From Swiss-Prot:
One of its GO terms (biological process) is regulation of jasmonic acid mediated signaling pathway. The gene is TIFY10B. This is Protein TIFY 10b. It comes from Oryza sativa subsp. indica (Rice). A motif (Nuclear localization signal) lies at residues 187-194. It holds the Pfam family tify. The keyword Ubl conjugation applies. GO terms for cellular component: nucleus. SMART domains: TIFY. Residues 194-204 have a biased composition (Basic and acidic residues). Keywords: Jasmonic acid signaling pathway, Nucleus, Transcription, Transcription regulation, Ubl conjugation. Ubiquitinated. Targeted for degradation by the SCF(COI1) E3 ubiquitin ligase-proteasome pathway during jasmonate signaling. It comes from the Eukaryota.
């Protein structure tokens, strides 16, 4: 009995010694929590807060943005908004590329020519071409021959050369010029003769006396013929005297 009780006592002593060792270890860990953490036992001290797990630093920040996928709840391709915006932008670009057009009016040969929606650059080229030409056109100018229209299916037609009428026009213009040059002295002499005659008449009318008595023209006196009540030309009219 005594032998059997001894081992029981020995086991109880072992259990108590192990419990004491555990209690001492836990007390030590609580008191020295930093040292236990360094050992990596997973035991923290009494006043120590739980530590967050260390995170990894990404050396390529663009990878996270690539992985993000956005979900479009209102896609524009399903409606008409994006298409209308594209058409409006294309129309604005076309307007910017298209040259400005205005109305062009040309006065030529006594006629008025009006062209609508004429490009501005072509109008400038036309003005430069007109300024290069002669400023004074001849009176009998030859009309330009129409340009020949070439057609691949038909044989080319020969355009007749225009007959110039400038030599005949110059000859006709020289004839009256020569005639006027020959008539100039005669016309001047006639006008000078008329002027001298008028001047002579004015001088004769303004002279206060005659140059000689022979030059004086006799003045013919006509008998007085004053009829008085039908008595004839020789009737004598006596004045009537009023009595006082």
């Amino acid at each position: 009995m005594a032998a059997s009780a001894r081992p029981v006592g020995v086991g109880g002593e072992r259990a108590t010694s192990f419990a004491m060792a555990c209690s001492l270890l836990s007390r030590y860990v609580r008191q020295n929590g930093a040292a236990a953490a360094e050992l990596g036992l997973g035991i923290r001290g009494e006043g120590e807060a739980p530590r967050a797990a260390p995170g990894t630093m990404s050396l390529l920040p663009g990878e996270a943005e690539r992985k993000k996928e956005t979900m479009e709840l209102f896609p524009q391709s399903a409606g008409f908004g994006q298409q209308d915006a594209i058409t409006a932008d294309s129309a604005a670009d076309a307007r910017e590329q298209e040259p400005e057009k205005r109305q062009l009016t040309i006065f030529y040969g006594g006629k008025v020519l009006v062209f609508n929606d004429f490009p501005a650059d072509k109008a400038k080229g036309l003005m430069q071409l007109a300024s290069k030409g002669s400023t004074v056109a001849p009176q009998n100018a030859v009309a330009p021959a129409p340009a020949a229209v070439t057609d691949n299916t038909k044989a080319p037609m020969a355009v007749p050369a225009p007959v110039s009428s400038l030599p005949t026009a110059q000859a006709d213009a020289q004839k009256p010029a020569r005639a006027n040059a020959s008539d100039m002295p005669i016309a001047r002499k006639a006008s000078l003769h008329r002027f001298l005659e008028k001047r002579k008449d004015r001088l004769n009318a303004k002279t206060p006396y005659q140059a000689s008595p022979s030059d004086a023209t006799p003045v013919k006196k006509e008998p007085e013929s004053q009829p008085w009540l039908g008595l004839g030309p020789n009737a004598v009219v006596k004045p009537i005297e009023r009595g006082q």
